[in-house]
Amino acid sequence: MIRYNLTEFFKLSAALNYQLSVSNDLSWNILRIILGDVKLSQEQHDIMLDALSYLNHAYKDQHRRMGPLSVLHPLRATAILSRTVEKVNMLDLLTELLHDKHEDINVSNYPEDKYGKDYYQQLEKEFDHFLYKNDPNDNWYLMERLDLLSRKGEESYFTYIGRLMNRARQTPELVRVKLADRLDNTLDLHSEFYDPIEHTDFFAELFHILYIKNYQPPEPEVQHPIRHPLYGAYRLYQLFKNAVLMSIIRRRQSMSHDAAAQPLLEQLIRASMEEAQRVIIHIFNYHLKDVELQRRLLLDTMDYCQKGGMLEITRPGNRSRLDGLFMNYFEYGSAEEHKQKLDMLYKDKPLMIQTALAFVTIFKNFLLDPNYYIEGIHETGFHPREGL
């Protein structure tokens, strides 16, 4: 089983992107990359190729916020699923490949001035042709899963994940599909090939800051990266989404319905913890270089965590700047408010450090304690205890 750190993620992305660049169609070579060791019949291979052709036409020249082709996301997520979960079947693979169909492939995304007349209708005909060749029973379950995996209108992320986990008792494979989706999204937050995690012993660096009185950190090996759309506060928000997903999974005991997905959960936990570490290393290297300030932030956050601050949702208060952290910066009522809150967090580098340290603690708890989850996270939102 491959451990998907950032390096392995880039290798997978490069292999898929190379195949996309040498052919206008999603080829048999791409299917082999996706399947890994999964064995399919010739008929199933042909159906998978039809699904890939549909995705190729549906995503066409569309790009993700970071810049890569949009079609890479479902391809990578499916490859991660097939290489991480011990036993996957045809329905699992098709569900992962098409999990964003209802959100990404709708008539509003294909304006006539860009795609020509009736392009969306042609896509729907191609999808119907794919369904016609597939097993009718699988089609029923596939369409049900795709509907369940789609957020409905203004549905909050809490409600969406809660609804998915409610259904996991009947359809346990939803857990593995969502975990593979989130693992790919978590790893897809960077374009720079240099990964500070591979060049810095994170916990040794914290030890030096805390215990060596006149410690002088080495200069960073590379210049400050150019800011890109997925800036630090946005990446912290993605970690918040992972913490919500993991907490609801743990609280609902959803992994008991799909124990084979446990390696995916562990990989998502590790990827999330490492992303929080990257945020800290970056800010210490380029923005807050005063070791005394770094030490104060570490000690203050450590004290807050040791007193149980990261065990449950808290309201804003005077105990610490971390009181009410999730409610203050990650809860929002509109897209504009969401952006404003993340911009506020981004400008407050000391709080970003403490937030990232809190996430390192949260994900370490998830890794070490199989019963850990953040109290107060429910499908209806945040519910802190009275007095907190």
Feature-to-residue mapping (PLM):
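Active-site helical microenvironments for divalent-metal-assisted chemistry
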Residues: 2-388
